[in-house]
């Protein structure tokens, strides 16, 4: 079915720029874009439907390329404790922190995890998100990592959103492997990844490279195993210290390296050469009251693509609005609104290996877009909170969220 979407202005985000088309129209055929351009250049079309967008600004559907949406439990009590002066170490010693989320996730049924994740996902969808990545990493054994990944697949099959599933078994050390990190990494590589990949539950593999998680050498083992399974890799790197994780990610042609507050210019050079995307997570930076900024000038100087994401998770970034992250990226990291919008469209698609089909409005790409009732594209990064009036189109069909 062909649909003409007319009377709009378009920020197509082609090549990662606004790439504005004034007084524009889009023709979709099924789930794909068949034509896009100034309305005056549109030949008399044959179409089944004609939809007037009322002068709206149209952007690609937003892409949240780094989330931990599926988890059990609630850590708002820890948030309150920290603000009362209890240290993270004290909370962890009492069984809190990520360990509490692992316990709650293991205890939850698949249906319970689905129900709670679906509620969180709905907030993202209402913000204009049409594609989202979700990670495992709160199960930390084969049974529970499988359970999380099954929930992620189920969300993609039942909700009006494209979902990419990432296995983050190398997120933290589970209690049964205390002081045995090498054994756990071997278990991930020899048992968990092959089984989960064989079941079709994994689109990419991630790890946490940090002094309080896994070493570069241990992460490299995971990357080698992922490569043997033909799975692309991603990496949490340089959030709290500089271990060279982002350069390691670049060496293995990772889709992305994420966080990056402590990365060096040499890391930026390596990432640029590899085409590895820098995924910045301003929500975690804000929530943890960090002070070490990502090296924005080095990223720009060397042409590293920059994406933005919510990092939605229970411990360090309980963020339910990707649009709020646009403002945070501009305010905290001094990104421009154009850079920030590219970070949740064009470059976010790159970070998921989806740039051939998603991330910009171009002929042949998937017809995922949002028609916003705004005065200019910068409004998306300008307004703090609220629910901007919008119409969301996914695969060429208007969604009601």
Swiss-Prot record:
GO biological process terms held by the UniProt record: L-histidine catabolic process to glutamate and formamide; L-histidine catabolic process to glutamate and formate
Chain's role: Catalyzes the hydrolytic cleavage of the carbon-nitrogen bond in imidazolone-5-propanoate to yield N-formimidoyl-L-glutamate. It is the third step in the universal histidine degradation pathway.
Annotated catalysed reactions: 4-imidazolone-5-propanoate + H2O = N-formimidoyl-L-glutamate
Compartment(s) where it occurs, according to its Swiss-Prot or TrEMBL record: Cytoplasm
Cofactor remark: Binds 1 zinc or iron ion per subunit.
One Pfam assignment: Amidohydro_1
InterPro entries assigned: Amidohydro-rel, HutI, Metal-dep_hydrolase_composite, Metal_Hydrolase
Gene Ontology MF: a single term: imidazolonepropionase activity
Binding site for N-formimidoyl-L-glutamate: 138, 313, 315
GO cellular component: cytoplasm
UniProt protein name: Imidazolonepropionase
Keyword set includes Cytoplasm: yes
Cofactor dependence: Zn(2+); Fe(3+)
Pathway(s): Amino-acid degradation; L-histidine degradation into L-glutamate; N-formimidoyl-L-glutamate from L-histidine: step 3/3
Top-rank EC class of the record's enzyme: hydrolase
Similarity comment: Belongs to the metallo-dependent hydrolases superfamily. HutI family.
Binding site for Zn(2+): 66, 68, 236, 311
Entry binding sites for Fe(3+): 66, 68, 236, 311
Binding-site residues, 4-imidazolone-5-propanoate: 75, 138, 171, 239, 316
EC number per UniProt: 3.5.2.7
Coiled coil: none
CDD domains assigned: Imidazolone-5PH
Sorted UniProt keywords: Cytoplasm, Histidine metabolism, Hydrolase, Iron, Metal-binding, Zinc
């Amino acid at each position: 079915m062909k649909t003409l979407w007319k009377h709009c202005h378009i920020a197509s985000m082609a090549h990662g720029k606004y790439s504005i088309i004034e007084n524009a129209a889009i023709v979709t055929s099924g789930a794909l874009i068949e034509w896009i351009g100034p309305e005056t250049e549109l030949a008399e079309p044959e179409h089944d439907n004609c939809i007037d967008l009322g002068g709206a600004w149209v952007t690609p559907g937003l892409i949240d390329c780094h989330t931990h949406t599926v988890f059990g439990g609630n850590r708002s009590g820890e948030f309150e404790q920290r603000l009362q002066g209890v240290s993270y170490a004290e909370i962890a010693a009492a069984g809190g922190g990520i360990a509490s989320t692992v316990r709650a996730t293991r205890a939850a049924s698949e249906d319970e995890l689905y129900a709670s994740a679906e509620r969180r996902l709905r907030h993202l969808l209402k913000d204009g998100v049409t594609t989202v990545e979700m990670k495992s990493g709160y199960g930390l054994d084969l049974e529970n990592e499988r359970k999380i990944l099954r929930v992620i697949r189920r969300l993609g099959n039942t909700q009006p959103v494209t979902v990419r599933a990432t296995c983050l078994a190398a997120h933290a050390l589970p209690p049964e492997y205390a002081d045995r990190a090498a054994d756990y990494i071997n278990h991930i590589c020899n048992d968990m990844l092959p089984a989960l990949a064989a079941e079709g539950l994994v689109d990419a593999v991630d790890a946490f490279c940090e002094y309080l998680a896994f070493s570069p050498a241990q992460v490299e083992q995971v990357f080698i195993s992922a490569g043997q399974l033909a799975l692309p890799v991603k990496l949490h790197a340089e959030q709290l210290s500089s271990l060279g994780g982002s350069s390691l990610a670049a060496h293995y042609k990772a889709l992305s390296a994420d966080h990056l507050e402590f990365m060096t210019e040499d890391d930026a050079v390596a990432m640029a050469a590899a085409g590895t995307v820098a995924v910045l997570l301003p929500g975690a930076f804000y929530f943890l009251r960090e002070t070490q900024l990502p090296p924005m000038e080095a990223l720009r100087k060397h042409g590293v693509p920059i994406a933005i994401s919510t990092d939605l998770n229970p411990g360090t970034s309980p963020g339910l609005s990707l649009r709020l992250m646009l403002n945070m990226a501009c305010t905290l990291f001094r990104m421009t609104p154009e850079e920030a919008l590219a970070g949740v469209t064009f470059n976010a698609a790159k970070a998921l290996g989806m740039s051939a089909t998603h991330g910009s409005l171009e002929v042949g790409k998937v017809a995922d877009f949002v028609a916003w009732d705004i005065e200019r594209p910068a409004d998306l990064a300008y307004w703090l909170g609220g629910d901007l009036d919008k119409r969301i189109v996914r695969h060429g069909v208007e969604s009601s969220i």
